[in-house]
Each structure stands twice: as C-alpha cells, then as structure tokens.
Amino acid sequence: MTKKKALNPLPYLASIVFLPWGISLSFNKSMEPWVTNWWNTSQSETFLNDIQEKNILEGFIKLEELFLLDEMIKEYPETHIQKLRIGIHKETIQLVRMHNQDHIHIILHFSTNITCFAILSAYSILGNEELITLNSWVQEFLYNLSDTIKAFSILLLTDLCIGFHSPHAWELMIGSFYKDFGFVQNEKIISGLVSTFPVILDTILKYWIFHYLNRVSPSLVVIYHSLNE
C-alpha cells in the first residue's frame, strides 16, 4: 500500500507537466477556424495596441514610398507601371492579412492561457492529497542528496535566475508574456522589471539561506559560500 501511494504522484506530476501543453495544442487547432471566421466576419472595429499600430504604420509608410517611386518613374512603359501597382496591391493585402493573423493569435493564446490556468487551479484544489504525497517525495529526494550536490544545484539555479547574463533571459520571458496576452510592450516597464525582479529574488534567497539553511544544515551553507567564491 505504501509503495502504491508513493507511485501515485508520478502520473499526477506528468499530467501537470504535459496536460497544459496538450490542451494548448488541441485548443489552438480546434478553435483557430472558429476564431478566424468570427474575426473576419463579426469584427466591426479595429483596435490596435501601440506596438501593432507602429508595425502597421511602418508597413504603410513603405507602401507610400513605393507609390512615390511610382510617380517618379511614370516615363517608364505602361506594362512596367502596371506590374508595380499590382505588386503594391498584393503587399497591401498581405499587410492586412498579417494584421488579422496577429489578432487571431493573441485571442487564441489568451484563451489557451486562461484555460490552462483554470485546469491547473482545479488540479491543485482537487488533487490536494497527491500534492501532499508529491511534496513528501520531493523532500525525501532532496534530503538524500549530498550537501555538495545541494550547494551546486542552488548555485546553478541562482546563476541562471539572477546571474550576470540573466537580464537577457528575463527580457525574453517578460516580452513573451506581454505578447501572449496581447499587452502593450512598454520598454520602461520591462526595463524596470528586469532591473528590480532579480534583486528581489536575490534578497529572498539570501534571507532563506540565512534563516533556514543555516539552521537546518550549516555545512551546506559553508559549501555554498565556498563554491560561490
């Protein structure tokens, strides 16, 4: 009975890891035709955020430059000018399609994220017993590791999250979050988060090491500081 209970959290953990990805993929595939049809037929207003508006304006500026070029080369043969106008028309249609596709992807990503969050919340509420067993299993696994491996793992994790090269990773993650939810990418806000969030994490880590690890395993703290130096 104990062995069976110990194995129960493993399928639970696998479902937590793979279920959101599977739902995201199936949800996008099944809902994309419906969202595309709804956006193209029922959408009466065009609402852009600052980034999308900037991209659209840049695209139309390029088209305007092509029109000016068209005016400058009117002495060219009519067939050449006609081909140029057809090309500009195709580029305009492509620009509108890209704009619509961006909105469709934002709607799909936002809906998928909300669905995955709801499923994970239901898992955490309904699977309380599995979470307790999983927590005890993780604690037992960490307890059996040597202090050197623990210190090395903590050092590796902290370097990845708050190390010298971490701001680039934080910029990518925050930018991806903004893009998935369709928010306006404010460079000042992103820069502020990148400069302050790692500092907050570093402070929390030092507090945890001082108040928890120093009490539970002083040798681990000594090894950690030795590796860090």
UniProtKB/Swiss-Prot annotation:
Q: What is the protein's major site of localization? A: plastid
The record's listing under InterPro entries reads:
CemA
Membrane topology label: Multi-pass membrane protein
Q: Where in the cell is it found?
A: Plastid, Chloroplast inner membrane
Membrane-spanning segments: 7-27, 106-126, 189-209
Going by the entry's taxonomy, the superkingdom of the source organism is recorded as Eukaryota
Please give the coiled-coil regions recorded for this protein: none
State the reactions this protein catalyses.
K(+)(in) + H(+)(out) = K(+)(out) + H(+)(in)
> What GO terms in the biological process aspect are recorded for it?
potassium ion transport
Give a GO cellular-component term: chloroplast inner membrane
Q: Which UniProt keywords apply?
A: Antiport, Chloroplast, Hydrogen ion transport, Ion transport, Membrane, Plastid, Plastid inner membrane, Potassium, Potassium transport, Transmembrane, Transmembrane helix, Transport
Q: Name one GO molecular function term.
A: proton transmembrane transporter activity
Q: What does this protein do?
A: Contributes to K(+)/H(+) antiport activity by supporting proton efflux to control proton extrusion and homeostasis in chloroplasts in a light-dependent manner to modulate photosynthesis. Prevents excessive induction of non-photochemical quenching (NPQ) under continuous-light conditions. Indirectly promotes efficient inorganic carbon uptake into chloroplasts.
What family does the entry list? Answer: Belongs to the CemA family.
What's the protein here called?
Potassium/proton antiporter CemA
The species is Nymphaea alba (White water-lily)
- Give the organism's phylogenetic lineage: Eukaryota, Viridiplantae, Streptophyta, Embryophyta, Tracheophyta
Q: Which gene encodes it?
A: cemA
